[in-house]
Amino acid sequence: MSDFVLTCESAADRTREFFASRNIPVVCFHYEIDDVVYTDDLYQSITPDEFFAQIAAGAMPKTSQVSVGEYEEFWEPFVAEGKDVLHLTLSSGISGTYGSACVAAQMLADRYPQGGKVRVIDSLAASSGFGLLAECAADIRDGGASLDETAAWIEEHKLNLHHWFFSTDLSSYLRGGRISAASAIIGTALKICPLMTVDCEGGLSPREKIRTKKRAISEMAKTMMAHVQDGADYSGKCILSHSACREDAEAVAALIEELVPQLKGKIEINNIGALIGSHTGPGTVALFFMGDKRVD
């Protein structure tokens, strides 16, 4: 039995059942649609299809990070009982939540000098990639590692976690300032599906402009083959997430499972959560796996 509590955030885009089964408490982000604030509660109060249908109909969600007070409230029961906490945050290259978490951890340390301590790690990850890193951390913890040992493993390996994604709908990327209006118009006209990644600083980085979804799916699989250490003999885990385009995710999964038959289990396909989905909109497919280190 581990002697610490492993926690993370709703932006990790895994199911409620997954987090419960791995004993990982989750703190939730928030989003706002038409002046109404909602909790990013892992689709407990709304379905993914309903959420993305609102965006497709013109809704423009605004997101907000977890506040210092919410972190305090989330961790205080553990700290007050003398339990140490290891917390993983959404990438600092995407959100300012890492800074808020660090402030809250210090405030609890001041309030409970004899209580448990909270150690905060910037995951430099997002969506189900963040969730895959949390799963790896739980595996290390459940293998008997201490908090310090688990934290050291995460810090050493978090840049081995790859994120690759493409989108067939550039509307939300345009609204969020990820691409220019000209790029969106040209991209839509030419059926361009930009291939993007999360770089070594945890920020979003466009890599290739690919014409047609079919080619984007093929290129995504080739990119994975180029970054996993054992190529077709890769035996690690692979996860996909999507925003209201499961058939596209299934096409990627089928191709990768054909190319990499030694994968650890079938590829898990998740829904992109409401926080990340507020920025991607519908039409995004994302691939996550452990490979060589991200260097740019």
Residue map of PLM features:
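Glycine-rich phosphate- or other oxyanion-binding loops that anchor nucleotides, phosphorylated ligands
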Residues: 56-92, 99-103, 147, 151
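Positions that flank functional sites
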Residues: 34, 93, 202
